[in-house]
């Protein structure tokens, strides 16, 4: 009889513990509400459409080969226009072509950089660009600069495909506002947090030979504009 009573008591205690655990999972923790359910206003914005001749510069070591670039008429057929760009198709007709003539096979790389850093307002979540590849296993990186002017590179993907493909990379958030890619600070005024410097292509040593072609179009970002869109109209701007 004592064993039966003891077992019943243990069963009741276990059920209460499970109920308490389930309640703690379902009920919001006041200490985490601000962090877990912060408001956001994500928008996809155009950063550059590669429409201006001379706005991008290409470079590679003179020991490795010769690189040139120019604009061409063209567009990815699968590209969807942004809502703000509907009806403006005539303003988006160019792509940036890059040609590399390798001297020899080796561990080569080349860069495609904007003539000026491209600032993105808000807190950038992802970057995307349309790339026309030639099925060679080179690798593309985005070169960015954070709020404090520190340089970072973000892996966008392999170029081992033919035709147009949209490559996307995630911008990792800073864990503490000091390390990693910092995009805002309460201590240093109000300014765009992320700047795009350009791209770097790391070449596959076995395929870095002959002539290589690639094309770029429609550089975009998904950014959180909540703080900007909910800024009081009569508030002052800390940008002087």
Question: Where on the chain are the PLM-derived regions?
Answer:
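Bacterial N-terminal signal peptides
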Residues: 8-16
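Small/flexible residues
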Residues: 4-5, 202
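Beta-rich carbohydrate-recognition modules and glycan-binding surfaces
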Residues: 21-240
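Positively charged n-region of N-terminal signal peptides that target proteins for export
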Residues: 1-4, 21
């Amino acid at each position: 009889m004592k064993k039966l009573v003891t077992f019943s008591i243990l069963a009741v205690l276990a059920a209460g513990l499970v109920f308490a655990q389930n309640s703690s999972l379902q009920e919001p923790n006041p200490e985490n509400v601000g962090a877990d359910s912060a408001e956001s206003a994500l928008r996809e914005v155009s950063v550059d459409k590669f429409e201006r001749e001379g706005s991008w510069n290409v470079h590679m070591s003179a020991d490795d080969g010769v690189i040139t670039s120019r604009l061409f008429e063209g567009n990815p057929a699968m590209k969807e226009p942004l809502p703000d760009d509907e009806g403006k198709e005539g303003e988006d007709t160019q792509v940036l072509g890059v040609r590399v003539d390798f001297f020899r096979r080796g561990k080569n790389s080349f860069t495609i950089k904007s003539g000026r850093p491209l600032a993105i307002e808000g807190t950038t979540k992802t970057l995307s660009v349309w790339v026309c590849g030639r099925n060679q296993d080179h690798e593309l990186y985005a070169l960015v600069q954070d709020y404090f002017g520190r340089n970072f590179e973000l892996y966008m993907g392999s170029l081992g495909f033919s035709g147009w493909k949209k490559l996307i990379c995630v911008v990792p958030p800073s864990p503490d506002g000091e390390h990693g890619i910092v995009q805002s600070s309460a201590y240093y005024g109000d300014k765009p947090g992320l700047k795009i410097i350009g791209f770097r292509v790391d070449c596959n040593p076995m395929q870095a030979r002959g002539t290589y072609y690639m094309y770029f179009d429609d550089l975009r970002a998904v950014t959180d504009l909540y703080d900007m869109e909910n800024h009081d109209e009569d508030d002052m701007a800390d940008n002087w």
